[in-house]
Amino acid sequence: MSSLSTTLPPTPPTADPDAPSQIAWPDTEPHRWLASLLNGSSYAYIVAPMVDQSDLPFRFLSRRYSSNLCYTPMIHSRMFTTDVKYREKFMPKFDEAKHPMGGPVFHQFCGNNEETMLAAVNLLPSYCEVVDINCGCPQGIAKRGGYGAFLLEEGDLLVKIVSTLVTKSDRRVTVKVRDDA
């Protein structure tokens, strides 16, 4: 599968979130895929991932108040592959996108090794269609582990991780970065 290497076009705020956008989305496969996730909405209301907060009840609540895309909390790829209790905590129990209160979920992983990241992604059930590489976490633990925002300092490694996931998994791959500008 191909990766989504684009950002949403800017849209002006409006009282009606389903009002047609003034900006035409390019007719590319990634844009068509993203539009399909939004169920026809011209706007993406995304609940960004939050450590230990973006769990299932929070995602359900977020969707109740208009979010149409949600992330899981950051999942550590090495721990997901080696620690059974950790994996049980973060392993999806059902297809959230098909639940009446659910919707699309981006399963966010952090790590600094392409094979470990691939092994973690391959443990997910097949209905988990999208994985996200965390390149935004600025916390000290991410710095010590060489992942999150600090992975951006290792461009060659990041390219290896993205390339490995895109070519060797059957999931969509996105990368979350932090823009502190």
Task: Give names to the regions the model predicted.
Residues 72, 130-138:
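Non-cysteine beta-strand/loop elements that form the S-adenosyl-L-methionine
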Residues 77, 145-156, 181:
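Conserved non-cysteine loop/helix-boundary elements of the Radical SAM core domain that shape
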Residues 91-104, 151-175:
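Alpha-helix-loop-beta-strand connector modules within alpha/beta enzyme cores
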